């Protein structure tokens, strides 16, 4: 996707609301389940407590006792994505029908005939224009949709589509402020703890024609993933690793641990951060975070032994937390990669099975702002 997404200049940033009425779930289950007693039982269960009239997923998403409601939320999102995929397939097969006629699958043929007989407006070609590819990314309730089209009018039509989609199918008045049209070149978007944007790079090429030597500027687009250093420093300040300006602090709550446990905790944090943000080309922000953890670890040890940082450097060496097996492995991989390919490129670790804690906190703070 990194090599294809730069074909588009705009993208849709959609935030699905965490709050929804339980009756919506009952209507969704009614489409798939014909067991009426089960539907009555589900309605009774959801309406038993008054505070569940509007479900707040954020409050019980990680609690074991609320696994049933997590299942309902996942089923709710699954229904949304399944129907959206079905509409997209029909939309690209039948160009002679408005896209909102496919929103409700119940008696869709009768409704389409009824609409087409009464509607005398010509079908707009811009609305039914095909697009070569659609990139759909979702994490929880945050959606990023990009189209391989540089016309902003196409995205405005898709924004109207989503507003009608939520209104007709889920009976929800979706706020237009939750669907934002962003420009890749002007606005960088935050997703899963990364900052993404498209940058234009000018490459100078010399062309020699017999006795003439001409310089040609080639503009190359590159999809860049950036480490959000300032938001990460703010999160580290909340965890008491540093202050707001990024100056390392002593982790007082860890001074009761042994030296090996302190080393293991700091080393584990740095290892997870380096693994998660290894896909970024510019590693300057990572080394800044590594500097904060190194000095925070040294200050924690100095506070524990009631000594100075210089004493800690003499005892454990100035390369504190940088001599582990993980960092030697990353240096070896990056060295071999640069020898094979002289150009500056990024590589991803494929053994990441969960989102980093700091990245998850950044994503959560973004959703709370919206």
From Swiss-Prot:
Record keywords, A-Z = Chloroplast, mRNA processing, Plastid, RNA-binding, tRNA processing
Q: Which terms does the record give in the GO molecular function aspect?
A: RNA binding
Name the source's superkingdom: Eukaryota
Gene Ontology biological process: mRNA processing; RNA splicing; tRNA processing
Keyword rRNA-binding among record annotations: no
| Compartments where located | Plastid, Chloroplast
Looking up InterPro entries in the UniProt record yields: Domain_X (IPR024937), Maturase_MatK (IPR002866), Maturase_MatK_N (IPR024942)
The main location is plastid
Q: Which residues form a coiled coil?
A: none
Could you name the Gene Ontology cellular component terms for this entry? chloroplast
Q: What does this protein do?
A: Usually encoded in the trnK tRNA gene intron. Probably assists in splicing its own and other chloroplast group II introns.
Protein family: Belongs to the intron maturase 2 family. MatK subfamily.
Checking PANTHER family in the record gives:
MATURASE K
Q: What is this protein called?
A: Maturase K
Give the species this sequence originates from. Marchantia polymorpha
- Give the gene name: matK
